[in-house]
């Protein structure tokens, strides 16, 4: 028997006044719908996020298996980790222009979803700074990257940047363990990034510059029971453009199926995911976890119409 789990990340929502008190899912056309129901994907007392929620949907209780977001992303990037290593998600973000980072405002947690080539050039420009500080900065995809501290203590208090969009960053800068190092890296990276030619060109083009880094999602290497052993599935795969979801798959022993044209945002090739899924099922996969990030990105940006459109594209080009 074939099994497929499809997850439209962030697709559910609260009623929204500008939409007449409806949700995007209510207003979207989705003729392929089946039965609706309610479920709790994040256990009570745990922070709500794509990491804990996707672990649950994969079948792994976050209260048992969750060890942080960034080590899952590190797994998808092929970064080897020892049990004593600590990782952090490193976003390229846009902060308001302020002499002191404590006086800045979080303008954009993704720097206008910066292009991959630009992001890698910026990461390469600041990586020597990190090496000199005794840590590693690994380039990921678009605005999502990874900081690794080898044999380090954990316990930093960090805020996801998408939770403070449009707000002052004061009060949300690193606290707790590794505070001094993380804050120093942020401040020194900002000095380099603000002057970088890539950002000067982005400003001239009317795009947000990636003028700072932002650390969050601290964690250590997870230990997931292999999916095959846990559920008796002979061959399983993951289709997603998001490092986090790919990383859960890698840690669970599933295959990550590459799909050209998918972006982890709402300008993405929805149909390509559908075609890849059909081909995978025909070629011997018994289980697929298909993840689409588009609705979640629209939600973070407050783009209701784009979220409705994304839901309709999912129904028409993947489910149908």
Question: Where would I find each of the regions flagged by the language model?
Answer:
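A long, amphipathic alpha-helix that forms part
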Residues: 206, 297-320
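Anion-binding catalytic surfaces of enzymes that hydrolyze or transfer phosphate/sulfate esters
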Residues: 220-306
């Amino acid at each position: 028997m074939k099994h497929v789990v499809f997850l439209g990340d962030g697709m559910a929502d609260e009623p929204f006044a500008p939409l007449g008190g409806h949700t995007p899912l209510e207003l979207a056309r989705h003729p392929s719908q089946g039965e609706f129901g309610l479920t709790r994907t994040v256990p009570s007392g745990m922070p709500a996020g794509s990491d804990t929620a996707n672990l649950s949907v994969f079948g792994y209780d976050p209260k048992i298996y969750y060890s942080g977001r960034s080590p899952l992303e590190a797994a998808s990037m092929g970064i080897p980790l020892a049990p004593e290593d600590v990782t952090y998600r490193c976003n390229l973000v846009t902060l308001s222009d302020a002499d002191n980072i404590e006086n800045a405002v979080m303008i954009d947690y993704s720097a206008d979803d910066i292009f991959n080539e630009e992001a890698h050039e910026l990461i390469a420009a600041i990586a020597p700074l990190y090496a000199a500080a005794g840590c590693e900065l690994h380039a990921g995809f678009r605005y999502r990257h990874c900081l690794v501290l080898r044999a380090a203590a954990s316990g930093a208090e960090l805020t996801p940047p998408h939770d403070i969009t449009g707000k002052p960053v004061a009060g949300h800068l690193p606290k707790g363990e590794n505070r001094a190092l993380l804050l120093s890296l942020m401040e020194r990276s900002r000095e380099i990034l603000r002057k970088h030619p890539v950002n000067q060109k982005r400003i001239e083009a009317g795009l947000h510059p990636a003028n700072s880094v932002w650390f969050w999602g601290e964690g250590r290497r997870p230990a997931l029971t292999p999916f095959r052993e846990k559920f008796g599935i002979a061959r399983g795969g993951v289709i997603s453009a998001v490092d986090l979801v790919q990383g859960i798959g890698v840690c669970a022993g599933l295959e990550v199926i590459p799909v050209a044209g998918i972006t982890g945002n709402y300008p993405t090739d929805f149909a390509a995911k559908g075609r890849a899924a059909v081909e995978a099922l025909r070629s011997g996969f018994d289980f697929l976890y298909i993840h689409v990030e588009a609705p979640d990105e629209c939600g973070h940006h407050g783009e209701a119409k784009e979220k409705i459109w994304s839901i309709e594209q999912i129904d028409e080009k993947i489910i149908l």
